[in-house]
Amino acid sequence: MAAASRPSWWQRWRRRAWARDGAKLLLFLLLLGSGPGPRHVRAGQAVEYLKREHSLSKPYQGVGTSSSSLWNLMGNAMVMTQYIRLTPDMQSKQGALWNRVPCFLKDWELQVHFKIHGQGKKNLHGDGLAIWYTKDRMQPGPVFGNMDKFVGLGVFVDTYPNEEKQHERVFPYISAMVNNGSLSYDHERDGRPTELGGCTAIVRNIRYDTFLVIRYVKRHLTIMMDIDGKHEWRDCIEMPGVRLPRGYYFGTSSITGDLSDNHDVISLKLFELTGVRTPEEEKLHRDVFLPSVDNLKLPEMTVPPTPLSGLALFLIVFFSLVFSVFAIVIGIILYNKWQDQSRKRFY
């Protein structure tokens, strides 16, 4: 059997070139398939779709200037090339960014890329920013630049401790609150009486990108963060039984007082999560019309007793006097009988 002829250098070079080109083509196809289309989340349990009508990223075309933009600016918020600045590092400023389109998704995930930085030293900066999913939009107020007694969900990145008992928690601090419109945010206690939970998050003046994710699936609220450059989500808040109506608006806001910071939003990306509900769960989880949390009693939710009317007060006093007189008469009768029996014993 004749020996096989060895390939020439040209044939060997062509084979190596084809191998390189094939690897490049495979890499190109993989990159092409990693765009904003659907992708599986958490071991294939759900598929998420980017919803552009509720998302915002660079270059922020038309934001704050075009009537056709999906986002509105409020207050001192400004559009820059690399971010949207809610407030500059100046005293007594407030700004907000609100989506114009109400969200009717059942299960969703909001990823927020933000940055908080400034010249202030330790405990001489503030106040932080908030991320909202609420019934009302574009309503300036004292709660991180938004209205008090809001209806919906608020997630707060609080950078300044107002309460004196600072040793109980380390700031900056992330917390969440669900409100039905009847609760006030307690600034003096950093929102502690009404918070669902929280965690420390060192997000100010750090060199890493800071991300926050709010995930709402089957009435289960999860808040996670990626703030240390490891590209891994860390749990912050986990709360089942959260009931949020559909048709509310996403937004973010910030406020400064005597202390200040730059509060920047780089991107907001909302994903619809599908494939997470069974047909039975679809029937069970009907729409709700007022935000609430199952089995959670908040101090401010207790209804104060209604004051008594004049007639009710009169009746209470009248019957109390009648009962007192009746008790005294009965007592006198019993006492007289006891005295009579005592005399009979002696005679």
Swiss-Prot record:
<feature type="binding site">
    <location>
        <begin position="257"/>
        <end position="259"/>
    </location>
    <ligand>
        <name>a carbohydrate</name>
    </ligand>
</feature>
<feature type="binding site">
    <location>
        <position position="187"/>
    </location>
    <ligand>
        <name>a carbohydrate</name>
    </ligand>
</feature>
<keyword id="KW-1133">Transmembrane helix</keyword>
<keyword id="KW-0333">Golgi apparatus</keyword>
<protein>
    <recommendedName>
        <fullName>VIP36-like protein</fullName>
    </recommendedName>
</protein>
<dbReference type="GO" id="GO:0005794">
    <property type="term" value="C:Golgi apparatus"/>
</dbReference>
<feature type="binding site">
    <location>
        <position position="162"/>
    </location>
    <ligand>
        <name>Ca(2+)</name>
    </ligand>
</feature>
<dbReference type="GO" id="GO:0005789">
    <property type="term" value="C:endoplasmic reticulum membrane"/>
</dbReference>
<dbReference type="GO" id="GO:0000139">
    <property type="term" value="C:Golgi membrane"/>
</dbReference>
<keyword id="KW-0256">Endoplasmic reticulum</keyword>
<feature type="binding site">
    <location>
        <position position="158"/>
    </location>
    <ligand>
        <name>Ca(2+)</name>
    </ligand>
</feature>
<feature type="binding site">
    <location>
        <position position="160"/>
    </location>
    <ligand>
        <name>Ca(2+)</name>
    </ligand>
</feature>
<feature type="domain" description="L-type lectin-like">
    <location>
        <begin position="48"/>
        <end position="273"/>
    </location>
</feature>
<dbReference type="InterPro" id="IPR013320">
    <property type="entry name" value="ConA-like_dom_sf"/>
</dbReference>
<keyword id="KW-0479">Metal-binding</keyword>
<comment type="function">
    <text>May be involved in the regulation of export from the endoplasmic reticulum of a subset of glycoproteins. May function as a regulator of ERGIC-53.</text>
</comment>
<feature type="topological domain" description="Lumenal">
    <location>
        <begin position="44"/>
        <end position="312"/>
    </location>
</feature>
<keyword id="KW-0430">Lectin</keyword>
<dbReference type="InterPro" id="IPR051136">
    <property type="entry name" value="Intracellular_Lectin-GPT"/>
</dbReference>
<feature type="transmembrane region" description="Helical">
    <location>
        <begin position="313"/>
        <end position="335"/>
    </location>
</feature>
<feature type="glycosylation site" description="N-linked (GlcNAc...) asparagine">
    <location>
        <position position="180"/>
    </location>
</feature>
<keyword id="KW-0325">Glycoprotein</keyword>
<keyword id="KW-0812">Transmembrane</keyword>
<feature type="short sequence motif" description="Endoplasmic reticulum retention signal">
    <location>
        <begin position="343"/>
        <end position="345"/>
    </location>
</feature>
<feature type="disulfide bond">
    <location>
        <begin position="199"/>
        <end position="236"/>
    </location>
</feature>
<dbReference type="GO" id="GO:0030246">
    <property type="term" value="F:carbohydrate binding"/>
</dbReference>
<dbReference type="GO" id="GO:0015031">
    <property type="term" value="P:protein transport"/>
</dbReference>
<feature type="binding site">
    <location>
        <position position="127"/>
    </location>
    <ligand>
        <name>a carbohydrate</name>
    </ligand>
</feature>
<dbReference type="InterPro" id="IPR005052">
    <property type="entry name" value="Lectin_leg"/>
</dbReference>
<feature type="topological domain" description="Cytoplasmic">
    <location>
        <begin position="336"/>
        <end position="347"/>
    </location>
</feature>
<feature type="binding site">
    <location>
        <begin position="160"/>
        <end position="162"/>
    </location>
    <ligand>
        <name>a carbohydrate</name>
    </ligand>
</feature>
<keyword id="KW-0732">Signal</keyword>
<keyword id="KW-1015">Disulfide bond</keyword>
<dbReference type="GO" id="GO:0046872">
    <property type="term" value="F:metal ion binding"/>
</dbReference>
<feature type="binding site">
    <location>
        <position position="190"/>
    </location>
    <ligand>
        <name>Ca(2+)</name>
    </ligand>
</feature>
<keyword id="KW-0472">Membrane</keyword>
<feature type="binding site">
    <location>
        <position position="92"/>
    </location>
    <ligand>
        <name>a carbohydrate</name>
    </ligand>
</feature>
<dbReference type="Pfam" id="PF03388">
    <property type="entry name" value="Lectin_leg-like"/>
</dbReference>
<feature type="signal peptide">
    <location>
        <begin position="1"/>
        <end position="43"/>
    </location>
</feature>
